[in-house]
Amino acid sequence: MTTTSKNCLTLTSIAAAVAAVLVLSACGGGSAGENINRKPTYLGTVVSVNYDGASDDLLTAGLGKTGLGATAPVAADPLNPTAAELRRIAIFNNYRALLDISVAGGYGSLYGPNVDASGVITTSEGKIAGTEYMAYSDDGTGNQNITMLVQVPTTFNPASPCIVTGTSSGSRGVYGAIGTSGEWGLKNGCAVAYTDKGTGTGIHDLQNDTVNLQRGERATATAAGKASNFTASLTSTERAAFNTATPNRFAVKHAHSQQNTEKDWGKWTLQAVEFAYFVLNENYGDAAKDGVSRLVKLKPANTIVIASSASNGAGAALAAAELDTKGLITGVAVAEPQIQVVPDTRLSVRRGASTLGGTGRSLFDYASLGNLLQPCAALASPTTNVFNTVNTTIATNRCNALQASGLIVGNTTAELAADAMARLLAAGHQPESSVLQASHYSFATPAVAVTFANSYGRFSVKDNLCGFSFAATGAAGSATPNAPVAASAAALATSFGASNGIPPTVGINIVNNNSVGGPLLDAASLSAGSVLDYNIAGALCLRELLGGSSANALKVQQGINEVLRTGDLQGKPALIVHGRADAQVPVAFSSRPYFGRNKIVEGANSRLSYIEVTNAQHFDAFLAFPGYGERFVPAHRYFIQAMDMMYANLKTGAALPASQVVRTVPRGLTGAVVNPITPANVPPIKTVPAVADQITFANNVVTVAD
C-alpha cells in the first residue's frame, strides 16, 4: 500500500482491479483574495473509491439490471464480510426495498437501470462508472456520526453541473435512496449527495458490546471508539446491569441516539450538498496559486441542485429547503413526504363532502392511533384486505380490549371492527387505504410507533420505554419460543447491508418486556390474564405519550414540536407527488396540509405544485405482495416524471405542472394473474390538468378533486 499527495487528494492505492481508495482532505492555504475550496469543519476523513462501471459501479454495485432482479448477493465469509461485499448487499436490498422489481410491474420498462434518462428502454445493464466519497459529519464528540456519501458519475459535466440529494427514506442507511433520487441523478449525469440523516444501521449489540463502523464492518465498541456509527450512551456499569436484567438486547441508532435526529434532517441534507460541492471543486476547481489548493468553481450561482427523495427522505428535502439560508437548493421534487406541519387553524382541506380543519396530524399521532386500532379494524373487511396476516383470534381480543378501554363501541366483533375502521377514517385516513390497514399493522405500524416514541423523547435503551426492547427471539419450535435469544452472528455481520434501520430487522424484533411470564416477542406476548391481544397495554402506553401529562409524555411532545415544519420553501419551485391510498403517511396528514400551509405563508410567491395519484400507496415494493399488484400502480413512475419536470424547469424554464389529481388505472387480474403494466395504467402528469382534476387553494381552503 502506497500513499501519495496531489491537489489535496491523499491517495491510498489498493491492489484491486476495480477500485482505488482515496482519503480526501483540505490542504494548502491559498493566497489572499482567492476563493479556496475548503473542507467543511464538520466533516471527518473522506474515503473515496473509484468504480469502473463494469465489475463494479455506482448504481448497482456491479450487479446490473439483471443482478438487482435476481437473488441476493452473499459474502464469501458470512461472518466477516468485506466493506465491498456489504456495500453490494446494501445497494441490492435498498434498491429493491423502494421499488417493485417485477417485470410485469414495470421494472425494466418504466424504470430500472436499463431505462435511460430519456425513458428509452435499452439492452444495457445500466452500470454507471464514477467515484464515491464517504465521510462522517460530527461535532467532534463521535456521538452524531451522520454518514454522508457523494457519488460523482464519470458523465458529470462541470460545464453544466447538477447535484441531487438522496437523503435516506424510512430509517435506512446511507444507500437508502439509491433506487429513487440516486438512480435519477446518476442517469442524468448529476452528483448525488446522500445522507443517512442520523438513522441507518447503527446497531449496538449490548450483550457482546459490538457496533457498526462507517462502511458496515463490525468491531467492539472499545476498538471502534469515535469511528463507531453508533454506540449507546451507557457506562460499562450501566451496560452490565442492563445485560443482567435484560440479556441479549440491542440499541438502535434511530431509536436510541437520544438526539431526536429528525429535528435536524434538513440540516444533514444541506450538509450533504455542501459535501458534494467540496468534492466537486476538489476535482474540477482550478489550481490555486499555492499549487496545492483548489479554487471554488462550482457554486449555487452556476449549479442546479434538486432536493429530492421519498418518504422520510422527502420530508428531509422539504425541511432543507425551508432551512436553506445559503441558496444551496435550486428546486425540490419529492415523493410521499413524511412531513409534519406547524399547527395553523386557518387552514382546511376539502375533498368531496369531507373537510378536515388544520394542518393534519403528527407522525406519532397517526402511528400510535393506528397501532391501537388497526388490528381490530383489520376485521372490518376481511375479504378485501390486502395481504392480511393479522391473526383473527388475537385481533378479536384487541377489539374487546379497546371496547373495555372505552375507545370503540359495538355489540359484536363485526361492529367493534367497523367502529375501529370508522375512527381511522374520521381521523383522516382516506377510504382508499382501508384495505391496507391490516398489512400495514403487520409490517410497519408498531415499528414506527416504538422507534419514533423513543427518538422523540430522547430515551435511552435502558429506559425500556413502555416496556419495549429490541432482541432476537426464539423460533416457534425452539426450546424458548418467542423469548429473547442470542442473535445470529451472520445476520449482525451483514446488518449494514440488510437492515432497514428500524426493528423488526435482520432478526432483531420488538419485545414486550412486560409479558406475563417473562419477555416475549411483542405480537406473541401475553397481556393481563394471559390474553393474546397484541399487547394492548403497550399500545395504550404509547398513545398516552401523545397527549398525556406524564414525564415521558412531556418529553415526547417536546420532541414532536421540534420536528414541525413551517411550509415556507422561500419561493423555491417545488413538486410533491403522493399516492392517495397511502396508509403509512396519509395524504391528509402530510402533503395536503403542507401544500395549504405553503400557500398561506408564501402567498403569490409560492411555486409549489401538489400531484396526488389515485391507486398509489406508500410501498412500491409491496406491489409484489398478494392483493397489491392488481389494485395499485407504482408511485415511482410519478417520482421520475416529477424529477424530469423539475430539471427541465430549472434548466430551460419549462413550465411546471399545476396541482392536480392523476387518475391511474389498476392493472387488474386475468384469472389469478396480475396483468402486466402498460402506459395506459399510468398516464402522465399534465402541465395543465382538466378542471375536474385540479387541486386548488383559495381563501385558506385546499380543494382536492374527488
UniProtKB/Swiss-Prot annotation:
EC id: 3.1.1.22
Function according to Swiss-Prot or TrEMBL: Participates in the degradation of poly-3-hydroxybutyrate (PHB). It works downstream of poly(3-hydroxybutyrate) depolymerase, hydrolyzing D(-)-3-hydroxybutyrate oligomers of various length (3HB-oligomers) into 3HB-monomers.
Range of residues in the leader sequence: 1-32
Catalytic residues (positions): 311 (charge relay system)
Chief place of localization: secreted
InterPro entries linked: OHBut_olig_hydro_put (IPR016582)
Cellular compartments annotated: Secreted
Family, similarity comment: Belongs to the D-(-)-3-hydroxybutyrate oligomer hydrolase family.
GO cellular component, one term: extracellular space
Catalyzed reactions: (3R)-hydroxybutanoate dimer + H2O = 2 (R)-3-hydroxybutanoate + H(+)
Keyword presence, Ribonucleoprotein: no
GO biological process: butyrate metabolic process
Organism listed in the record: Polaromonas sp. (strain JS666 / ATCC BAA-500)
Protein name, entry field: D-(-)-3-hydroxybutyrate oligomer hydrolase
GO molecular function list: hydroxybutyrate-dimer hydrolase activity
Pathway listed: Lipid metabolism; butanoate metabolism
Keyword Signal included in the entry's annotation: yes
Domain of life: Bacteria
Pfam families (UniProt xref): 3HBOH
